[in-house]
Amino acid sequence: MKKAGLLFLVMIVIAVVATGIGYWKLTGEESDTLRKIVLEQCLPNQQENQNPSPCAEVKPNAGYVVLKDRHGPLQYLLMPTYRINGTESPLLTDPSTPNFFWLAWQARDFMSQKYGQPVPDRAVSLAINSRTGRTQNHFHIHISCIRPDVREQLDNNLANISSRWLPLPGGLRGHEYLARRVTESELVQRSPFMMLAEEVPEAREHMGSYGLAMVRQSDNSFVLLATQRNLLTLNRASAEEIQDHQCEILR
């Protein structure tokens, strides 16, 4: 019993230290890199020269930009043209805020353009990390390939995912996930952030502790995946873990 208690204590210490390191990283200058690229480079260049560079696309009226990420051959980021830190922002549950997940899904075409041929929807995933699971303090949705093992697991659970938020059997990547099926028409009308905040008990008060992902299924529906930070299981709620930026699924 003493050994079990000691092991439990060690796990807590490790989790707290890991979280502390993550927070320390977020308080440095490098955590503002993406925001500076958007606000000091992409947006001004588009407004003054009609050139989105270094972004791939800048849509000031729609409130977003798309940037090629330096990691992976096909990974892109969708980001707002104004200050939003991340999932903890109350702006994400405001109906007047752009539906960033839907916009990010539309931006998947940049992957195909870069690849030189169509990237199948089943190979694409969207993900945003929690406050402790990210390295940048500017809201960004990762548009990238899905891990083949995650793709297979979601395919196998197609019949088990309903229109309500329920635990995904077996979780993903060793972490617990909630899963919810949504239709395209639902997704167009309502942001996944609002679905999470309004439908999962106490989620609205703890949005910053959630990572959120989205994948398309073979029946053309979408699956939303939400994971919440849990220090005891060393889960920092980095939903990006379901992605493979090297795109093995395309080989």
UniProtKB/Swiss-Prot annotation:
A biological process from GO: CDP-diacylglycerol catabolic process
Alphabetical list of Gene3D superfamilies matching this protein: HIT family - CDH-like
Reactions accelerated catalytically: a CDP-1,2-diacyl-sn-glycerol + H2O = a 1,2-diacyl-sn-glycero-3-phosphate + CMP + 2 H(+)
Pathway: Phospholipid metabolism; CDP-diacylglycerol degradation; phosphatidate from CDP-diacylglycerol: step 1/1
UniProt protein name: CDP-diacylglycerol pyrophosphatase
Gene this protein is translated from: cdh
Location(s), subcellular: Cell inner membrane
UniProt cross-references to NCBIfam families, sorted A to Z: cdh, PRK05471.1-5, PRK05471.1-6
EC number: 3.6.1.26
Topology relative to the membrane: Single-pass membrane protein
InterPro entries per record: CDP-diacylglyc_Pase, CDP-diacylglyc_Pase_proteobac, HIT-like_sf
